[in-house]
Amino acid sequence: NYYSRGVSPFIKNMFDSNEINGEAWSRYAAGYMWGITGIIYNPDAVSKEEASTWTIINNSRFKRQITIKDNVRDSMFAAIGAIKSDKLTSKSFLASKDYKEKLAQEMNDTSDDTIKEVQEYLQEVKDNAYSFETDSAKADMITGKVVAGYQWSGDAVYTMDQADKDDFTLNFAVPKESTNIYFDGWVMLKSGIGGNDEKKQAAQSFINFLSKPEN
C-alpha cells in the first residue's frame, strides 16, 4: 500500500521505536505528519529575541495580543518552559553531559509543586492572553488581531504562506528553553470497525488515499 511503501524513514523509526503499554505505535497507528511547537510572530511588533522564549506568553508588553493553545499538554509545556527558563538556559545546565535526559525530566515534571506552580502561572497567562484557542489563531495572526501566538509548526507554515499572499510577513521562532516534537497518526478504532470487513477496507483505503504523494 501507499503508506508502507512511502512512509518516511524518520516517521517509521519513531513509530517502531516508541511504545505504549508494550506495543509499538506502528502496531496500531499510521503516521500522518510531524512537527514542533514554537511562536509565530509579527516581526514589526515582536523581536526575534522576544519570540524565542516561552516567557513571551506572560509578557505584559503583548497583553491581549498573544494566543495560547487550548489543551493541557501544550499549555503546561509552555508554562514549564517559562517557569524554568533561567535554569534551562543556564550554562551549567546546557553543558550537562546528560543534558537530553535532564531536559526531558524537567519538561515532563508532574510533581505536585510543579503542577501547582504551573496552575498559578497559567492563571496569570489567562489574564495576559488574547485567547486560548485551537484553530482561530491562524486567522487572528493574518488579520493582525494579535502579534504573536503559540503555534504548531505545520499551522505556522500555513499561516505564514497565507500572510505572504497579502504581502504581510510573519516569522516563526523556536523557544530557547526547549520545544517538543509532535506526531499525528491515523488509527482504526476497534469499536468502530468491530470485525466489519467493509468498514476495515474503507478505513484502510482512506489511509492509503491520504498517503499518496499527490494528496
Annotate each PLM feature.
Residues G31, G38, V147-A148, N180, ...:
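A residue-level structural signature of the nucleotidyltransferase/glycosyltransferase Rossmann-like core
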Residues F62, V146, D166-L170:
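Local beta-strand N-terminus motif with an aromatic residue
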Residues A137, D155-A156:
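Alpha-helix capping/helix-boundary segments
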